């Protein structure tokens, strides 16, 4: 998909730890962090505090068990001092995109009153210690959210990019983590007296045929498979064209293929192919320098010159789908220009050669503008277009995308391969459906299970099961069976050693969400301290399968 990271970071990196400790102390010294006690109705099995109003018939709203009065020492971050500023930020500025999200944030969180945020824990030892109170470790909020700036060198000597890149022009997040980035993160930055990102853009989810993607349903779309079949640029174009900011978008193989055919093959690809072919056929590949204006020229030229400002405006508003729609309006206009000017008719009369050269030049320069503006969306294909239309690196600079007439008058073209081959829709859908069917869960013979002694619900409640995402995985040098997993458990990172190396390669596990037994006592396995255990199924002789969860389940979610 031509997606890569510039800098891979972990919250266990030394520089990040130093920065977080400095940030925590700075907020404490400013009076925004204070030590207190968390009091409330506590459910022991769920390890959760509840307010009186949250209880259901006086019991835990999650598991229905009895709750007890409990308290725990913790540090808190004051949220109330920032409530008014954050409400104005969300409702009176264009910080949040789409702005329609502001209503739910204000009504659900700010109007009821922002509660102070618990930012330390004493119930576990792993994490970043609070320098002035080592019994406490920094809880997830300050640790995780601050990595956006610590990775740039804020309060550390590792990097020197903070002044260069911060504040970010756009901070883009998914809708399920909107609250943290629209309320908590701005409050932290305000307390630190650091600038906020200029905009927070919240995108929706991609569904499949209107249904949530799920491995259990077998309808998860593999972008690598699609990229191999149609090219990364085609997939990037389809997804960005279909997704409107703030809304979920439904992915459909049929819609994708039809869009590739209509927009890319019949639209852009056909425009480039026809134009280059006519220059080669009628002028041997190089246009003469004489020009003769005629009907329809001004309309095309003005449309092409107006394209970059329109695209700039939509990108500034984080409306990438509209930016692409605007570009392809010009693609359609250029194809219509061919039909209006009928170059094949002009070519029949030698006296029309100058007019014909003008028509083809106008088309080539329009293609130059179109392809320059598409290069951020479709970076692999555009250089091929530039080579075909004879454009230099300077010709396709972003600055020149606002100008018409940049290509040399005697430009030379070079016909290349078909940019986007047409796809047989029915045949392709049949093959893709077969792939989906292949991925459907298969029924297997049930293994004989020897049961253990029954236990009570209270015994089971002692086990804390939690969703965790695998951040990194590597073999353990001293063992043939163990893999060392670095997990995000929703509160921080921890290391777990698991005897699954003969069943999984490390790169098959990275990014997966698994079930973690989170409250096992630490154990040392072949020199690795393991803080927990992941769940796997014994499917028979030499067959073990890790229990993977749906990727939409956030790390840290309790499993009951």
Residue ranges of model-derived segments:
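Secondary-structure transition/capping motifs at alpha-helix termini
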Residues: 30-32, 155-164, 189-198, 317, ...
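Beta-strand segments within the central parallel beta-sheet cores of soluble alpha/beta enzyme folds
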Residues: 199-202, 386-388, 484
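Phosphate-backbone binding interfaces of nucleic-acid-interacting proteins
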Residues: 441-560
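Structured secondary-structure scaffolds
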Residues: 15-19, 45, 63, 69-281, ...
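Conserved, charged catalytic cores of large soluble enzymes
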Residues: 1-117, 152-161, 272-311, 331-352, ...
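Helix-rich, typically C-terminal accessory recognition domains appended to large enzymatic cores
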Residues: 35, 242, 247, 255-293, ...
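Intrinsic disorder at enzyme termini
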Residues: 385-459
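N-terminal catalytic cores of NTP/NDP-binding nucleotidyl/phosphoryl-transfer enzymes
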Residues: 9-24, 29, 46, 63, ...
